[in-house]
């Protein structure tokens, strides 16, 4: 997953067991969903739909699985070991570049969550203030490209910034003062956590710092599966839209569903994270639920190519399809 606070091995194993126990159990068609990481507020629509039986209504026995390796979801789908996976737009572009025949079928979070996060005492009012600072990162190559873009736009020599890879454990160095900022934390997770601690974080998503905007989280399927057996995926998306609508109407119920499914989630913090997340789970304007903008995807894929993150140019038409979205079906039928 992209830059989240790390959890221990035992906690992750427990989360795997708990998430795996989330199936509707109504005798529907088995449907395996590989999550991006442990249960978190980005999954509010999923677990609300699961709690209310919407997947069962759609004829699906949903089995959400927490991956043992956060890089595994797309590989699970490509290998036929999952029906859908939650991943990230840049990961889809990278996977296609590496020859994996996968396609994004819906946006789960249609805007960047990845952010530059600092505390007031670091005195970072803008990216130009990063010169001479220590920034902890998750060590993800394309996020390093983001940071290079941001520094270049701000006129900062990357050599003047001490970038330290700490994996997903981004918060402790910032809280302790050993680092001036974190890059890669999510505005609705680390940003909210720091705010709930009363630390008044400055949180700036990457698209406000010069990185082309993109869909942070997407649902990914095997391209052959989409062509040959799309109906279960369509029904999943119908149920997920219902769950997301229900979560937006009743954030406390969404919080309760997440806390019940997750391992050791703090109810108050989870509610704050859910409140920060829900507005980002619905598309802008009148776009269908899950809509992905092909032109925006093309710009982002071109950016990754120009940044040296992929070897060949990518065509957005190969990266995504909006054909399985609920209202896309209504409009075509």
What are these regions (language model features)?
Residues 1-10:
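Bacterial N-terminal signal peptides that target proteins for export
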Residues 22-24:
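Bacterial signal peptide processing site
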Residues 90, 169-173, 178-264:
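Pocket-lining segment of extracytoplasmic ligand-binding domains
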Residues 297-333:
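Conserved C-terminal helix/tail region of periplasmic/extracytoplasmic solute-binding proteins
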């Amino acid at each position: 997953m992209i830059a989240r606070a790390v959890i221990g091995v035992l906690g992750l194993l427990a989360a795997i067991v708990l998430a795996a126990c989330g199936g509707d159990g109504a005798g529907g068609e088995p449907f395996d969903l590989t999550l991006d990481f442990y249960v978190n507020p980005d999954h509010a629509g999923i677990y609300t739909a699961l709690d209310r039986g919407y997947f069962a209504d759609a004829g699906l026995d949903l089995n959400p699985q927490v991956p043992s390796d956060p890089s595994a979801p797309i590989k699970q789908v490509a290998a036929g070991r999952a029906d859908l996976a939650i991943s990230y737009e840049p990961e889809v572009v990278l996977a296609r570049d590496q020859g994996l025949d996968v396609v994004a079928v819906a946006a789960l979070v249609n805007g960047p969550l990845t952010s530059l996060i600092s505390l007031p005492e670091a005195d970072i009012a803008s990216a130009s203030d990063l010169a001479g600072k220590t920034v902890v990162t998750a060590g993800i190559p394309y996020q390093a490209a983001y940071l290079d873009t941001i520094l270049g736009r701000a006129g900062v020599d990357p050599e003047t910034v001490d970038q330290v890879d700490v994996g997903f454990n981004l918060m402790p160095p910032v809280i302790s003062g050993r680092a001036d900022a974190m890059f890669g934390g999510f505005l609705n997770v680390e940003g909210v956590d720091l705010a709930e601690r009363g630390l008044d974080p400055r949180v700036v998503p990457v698209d406000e710092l010069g990185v082309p905007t993109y869909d942070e989280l997407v649902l990914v399927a095997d391209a052959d599966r989409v062509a040959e057996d799309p109906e279960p995926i369509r029904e999943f998306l119908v149920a997920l839209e219902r769950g997301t609508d229900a979560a937006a109407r009743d954030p406390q119920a969404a919080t309760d569903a997440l806390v019940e499914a997750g391992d050791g989630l703090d109810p108050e913090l989870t509610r704050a994270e859910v409140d920060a997340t829900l507005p980002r789970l619905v598309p802008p304007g009148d776009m269908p639920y899950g809509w992905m903008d092909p032109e925006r995807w093309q710009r982002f894929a071109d950016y990754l190519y120009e940044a040296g993150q992929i070897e060949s140019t990518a065509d957005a038409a190969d990266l995504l399809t909006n054909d399985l979205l609920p209202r896309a079906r209504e409009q075509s039928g």
